[in-house]
């Protein structure tokens, strides 16, 4: 359990840009992953089955690379609040539910999930706010082809489509959306702090 927690926290000890650069090294055309695929013959097998002539799997500058980078960078911020709530669960409630005839799925749905919702809400808040405004990941792993809201705002101020008024308007709308989402999630989290109904 402690080893798994350390593995989850390990990326947080590195700089955000270094973590993203490491994925560039892994995913690029002559990167570690494509070299591994070449050595085990996966690329040759793919070419044989589908009749292609690929030298490598194109993984950089794709939507999948951007999603992978965002998941890798922000997953610890989701897991840690949930872990901190689950580790404090009263195990007597779980035992009582099982004694009353509840199955594993029912125990999870009616006991564990309601009690862990404050951690889930906290994790969603911690992940949503930075991920909705990021632009470094999409630029580095997506090559500028996969635009996020942060990229759109950055282009209005620093890019070729110079339009600071539009950039300011998008920023304001995004800030309002983030604040509304945080208020809703906080209210939702408060509403879930109630007795567990079996």
Predicted segment positions?
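Transmembrane alpha-helices
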Residues: 10, 72, 77-92, 98, ...
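Residue-level recognition of pore/gate-forming positions within transmembrane alpha-helices
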Residues: 12, 70, 115, 144, ...
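Membrane-helix interface segments
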Residues: 1-4, 62, 92, 104, ...
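Interhelical loop and adjacent transmembrane-helix boundary motif
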Residues: 139-190
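Generic alpha-helical transmembrane segments of integral inner-membrane proteins
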Residues: 7, 71, 124, 128, ...
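Membrane-interfacial helix termini and adjacent extracytoplasmic/periplasmic loops
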Residues: 20-71, 105, 141-145
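C-terminal transmembrane helix and the adjacent membrane-cytosol boundary/short C-terminal tail
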Residues: 83-94, 98, 168-198
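Cytoplasmic-entry segments and transmembrane alpha-helices of multi-pass inner-membrane transporters
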Residues: 1-26, 94-95, 108-109, 113, ...
